[in-house]
């Protein structure tokens, strides 16, 4: 019988950038023994692998995902699996089970969840998990206890015999939890289920240096050699961390937002998007971070709105997580009542990017008395966005913007 797993997220910087603040970034900053820090390497490696697979499957489409959301949802699901299914799932997420126990993995996600929940008052943060269970199914008490303990997941009874009503109820639940920003999660999906797992993330933060609202102008965006679209192009003239990479064909800037996060905007040279994406790794990010210099930059970035639903089943199978979708799936730690297998792993993402920031002293950008000509950097062709929480080193979001319209 089918089991559906959904992850959904929202990054909506209508007041800057939607993000998370963990805790004091100076506290035990180098203490990599913290449970959540033990996840960092595996989570980032999984993030780039998943991103590259999705990009390859949709070479001309916008891509926007929250890797940490997907990792957390799949890790939670692993609590209900046994045997080869469990080992394959955790190894597919990048964990070496000879080096890290399953308990340590789940403790790491538990601490990560708790840190994300400790957002600053200037941020809005909602992150959660929910399990929707058909009334005919008896959930094993151990599974219910584990997902509540590690992932603070709610368990809600549903009547999946009436699929239309059940899907509306789940849509309503997610809509309420994400303050009306994630809607119609089940739109266009007609597969009945007896158990649905949902992971959702909603968060809002602010640019430390907002874009100048009055400077936004309509400009050309060159999608490809034959397609040009008009976009509202934002402008920020300030001191920004900038790098013209000598090894990869790209330029990039790193910008901070209120909290513990950082965002990279990467502009590949014309026709070199795939070259840059292929090189994305932890080593590349470390090299970029070390090479950035504070520069006077006139930065032009288009206002972006992207919405998409991704069925991750084929991608996960390519990445070695295959048992979930076959009759070999072993979900015997969820219930003894039925033979379950995953029919879908769906991830819904929404991205909006605009100018606004916190209206406080020192947060409206930097006015410069230029002694040299500023670098002019126009994101008027396909580009990459990466957002990290630099306390937990979580890969919050990865995007490829092919067409911002």
UniProtKB/Swiss-Prot annotation:
Intracellular or extracellular location(s): Secreted
Residues annotated as glycosylated: 31, 96, 176, 260, 330, 369
Organs and tissues of expression: Plasma; synthesized in liver. Has also been identified in a number of glycocorticoid responsive cells.
Entry superkingdom: Eukaryota
SUPFAM superfamilies reported in the protein's UniProt record: Serpins
One GO BP annotation of this record: glucocorticoid biosynthetic process
Domain notes: Proteolytic cleavage leads to an important conformation change. This reduces the affinity for steroids.
Protein name: Corticosteroid-binding globulin
Organism, scientific name: Homo sapiens
């Amino acid at each position: 019988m089918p089991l559906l797993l959904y992850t959904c997220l929202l990054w909506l910087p209508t007041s800057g950038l939607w993000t998370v603040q963990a805790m004091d970034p100076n506290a035990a900053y180098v203490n990599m023994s913290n449970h959540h820090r033990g996840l960092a390497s595996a989570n980032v490696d999984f993030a780039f692998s998943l991103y590259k697979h999705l990009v390859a499957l949709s070479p001309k489409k916008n891509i926007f995902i929250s890797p940490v959301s997907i990792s957390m949802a799949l890790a939670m699901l692993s609590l209900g699996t046994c045997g080869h299914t469990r080992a394959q799932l955790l190894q597919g997420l990048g964990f070496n089970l000879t080096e890290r126990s399953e308990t340590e993995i789940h403790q790491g996600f538990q601490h990560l969840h708790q840190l994300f929940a400790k957002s600053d008052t200037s941020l809005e943060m909602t992150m959660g998990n929910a399990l929707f269970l058909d009334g005919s199914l008896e959930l094993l008490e151990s599974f219910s206890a584990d997902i509540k303990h590690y992932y603070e997941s709610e368990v809600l009874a549903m009547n999946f015999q009436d699929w239309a009503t059940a899907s509306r109820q789940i849509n309503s639940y997610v809509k309420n939890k994400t303050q009306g920003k994630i809607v119609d999660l089940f739109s266009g999906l007609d597969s009945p289920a007896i158990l649905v797992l949902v992971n959702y993330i909603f968060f809002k933060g602010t640019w430390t240096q907002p874009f100048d609202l009055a400077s936004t102008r309509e400009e050309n965006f060159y999608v490809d050699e034959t397609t040009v679209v008009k976009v509202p192009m934002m402008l920020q003239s300030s001191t920004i961390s900038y790098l013209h990479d000598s090894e990869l064909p790209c330029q990039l800037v790193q910008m901070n937002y209120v909290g513990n996060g950082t965002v990279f905007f990467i502009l590949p040279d014309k026709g070199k998007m795939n070259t840059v994406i292929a090189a994305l790794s932890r080593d590349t990010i470390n090299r970029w971070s070390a090479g950035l210099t504070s520069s006077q930059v006139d930065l032009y970035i288009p206002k972006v709105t992207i919405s998409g639903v991704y069925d991750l089943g084929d991608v996960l199978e390519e990445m070695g997580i295959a048992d979930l979708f076959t009759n070999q799936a072993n979900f015997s730690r969820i219930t003894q009542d039925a033979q379950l297998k995953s029919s879908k792993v769906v991830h819904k993402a929404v991205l909006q990017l605009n100018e606004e920031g916190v209206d406080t002293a020192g947060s409206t950008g930097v006015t410069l008395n230029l002694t040299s000509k500023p670098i002019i950097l126009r994101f008027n062709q396909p580009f990459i966005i990466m957002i990290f929480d630099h306390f937990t080193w979580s890969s919050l979001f990865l995007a490829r913007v092919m067409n911002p319209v």
